């Protein structure tokens, strides 16, 4: 019997034909539209950002990714809180003068996933399996995870059913946990200026599992006990980065008496900052590193 892997992006051809239902997450993640543009650098030596810049907007957010010759920029938004024309104006406003003539592409998507990804001799991988939104590159992570699990669970002896049950249970739990992580970026925001942000912070839009974790973290930081290393694609450090990067306050006053290493911690943080300043002053710029990689076959094929 032949095996099939459904990785088709737009039509998701196999799953609908097999009547595998799609579980929508629109009640949790409101964004369902995107507008993308490519913006060439004004100068060939213009700096390349070494990270993706994500900027919150009235009804969504904008991504800004620096590449070697251009920036990839897009606006992700909710059609329940904005419309295509308004969202495009927001994007062009972010682009500035260069955005007046920039070509843009509009996309529609729905946040969600399939609760059954392995059915008989077919497996859904990548966007045919599920998609939340461009935030945190969960699509790439899930494609890699799926490929690894298929390799480990491949039914060489014909044990399709047992392999499928394990694969589906694992993927379902991964999607549920990743959904919580993406929602975290919205639900702890301090913004209340638009309906989009007010709806996002309302408890009714937050999964019970995430509310439970937030209750824990009011009095202690996330730790390894909150994370399942066999399931979660984001570590406790990732949760901490988002929580405290967005200003979350963990009240440690009740255990102040046992926190005896405050001075040591301050010295350690000061040393980290010193090393960061040294690195900034002495390491090559991101553009220089990219140019070196292209000319010296650093991590890949040399430029032609």
Residue spans of the language-model regions?
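Generic secondary-structure boundary signal with a strong preference for alpha-helix termini
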Residues: 72, 139, 257-259
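Predominantly flavin-linked oxidoreductase catalytic cores and closely associated redox partners
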Residues: 1-98, 147
């Amino acid at each position: 019997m032949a095996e099939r892997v459904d990785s088709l992006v737009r039509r998701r051809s196999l799953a609908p034909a097999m009547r595998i239902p799609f579980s929508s997450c629109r009640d949790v993640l409101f964004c369902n539209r995107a507008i993308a543009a490519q913006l060439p650098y004004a100068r060939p030596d213009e700096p390349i950002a070494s990270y993706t810049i994500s900027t919150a907007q009235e009804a969504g957010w904008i991504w800004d990714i620096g590449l070697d010759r251009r920036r990839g920029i897009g606006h992700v938004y909710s059609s329940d809180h904005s419309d295509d024309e308004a969202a495009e104006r927001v994007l062009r406003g972010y682009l500035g003068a260069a955005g007046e003539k920039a070509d843009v592409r509009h996309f529609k998507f729905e946040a969600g996933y399939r609760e059954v990804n392995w059915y008989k001799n077919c497996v859904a991988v990548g966007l045919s399996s599920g998609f939340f939104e461009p935030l945190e590159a969960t699509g790439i992570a899930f494609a890699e995870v799926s490929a690894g699990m298929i390799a480990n669970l491949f039914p060489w002896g014909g044990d399709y059913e047992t392999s499928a049950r394990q694969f589906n249970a694992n993927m379902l739990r991964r999607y549920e946990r990743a959904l919580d992580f993406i929602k975290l970026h919205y639900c702890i925001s301090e913004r209340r200026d638009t309906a989009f942000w007010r709806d996002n912070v309302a408890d009714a839009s937050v999964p019970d599992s995430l509310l439970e974790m937030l209750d824990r973290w009011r009095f202690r930081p996330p730790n390894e006990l909150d994370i399942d290393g066999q399931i979660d694609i984001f570590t406790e450090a990732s949760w901490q980065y988002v929580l405290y990067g967005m200003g979350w306050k963990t009240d440690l006053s009740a255990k102040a008496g046992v926190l005896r290493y405050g001075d040591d911690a301050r010295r350690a943080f000061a040393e980290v900052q010193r090393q960061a300043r040294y690195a900034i002053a002495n390491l090559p710029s991101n553009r220089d590193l990219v140019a070196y990689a292209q000319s010296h076959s650093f991590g890949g094929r040399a430029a032609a």
